[in-house]
Amino acid sequence: MHIISKAPFEECARKYPNDALALHSLYRVIKETDFSTPEEMRTAFPNLDNFKYRNKWYVLDVGGNNLRVIAYINFVNKRFFVKHITNHAEYDKLTRYYRENKE
């Protein structure tokens, strides 16, 4: 898939060095694999889940469930755009924000 920017992965790896290896691994697998459907992506990432407050946004757990990647994924055009990489406390705040501020 085409990852729009590597910068969020690099920034998060600096911020959370204990999870840097997991972030780089996630980046590499997504970049090297063309997933056609969410179901196909779940074979590599069983924790992939819909982010129910935005269309085509998905959540991936990273680093033994320490971090969450929220991304817009277009499976037809093979595009992966990171919206947020954050810890669980921030994820809860973002979920609350998006729940209260519909598109």
UniProtKB/Swiss-Prot annotation:
Keyword Metal-binding belongs to the record: no
Superkingdom of the source species: Bacteria
Keyword Nuclease listed: yes
Pfam family, one: HigB_toxin
EC numbers for this chain: 3.1.-.-
Function (record text): Toxic component of a type II toxin-antitoxin (TA) system. A probable translation-dependent mRNA interferase. Probably counteracted by antitoxin HigA.
Family: Belongs to the HigB mRNA interferase family.
Name of the protein described by the UniProt record: mRNA interferase HigB
Native source organism of the sequence: Escherichia coli O6:H1 (strain CFT073 / ATCC 700928 / UPEC)
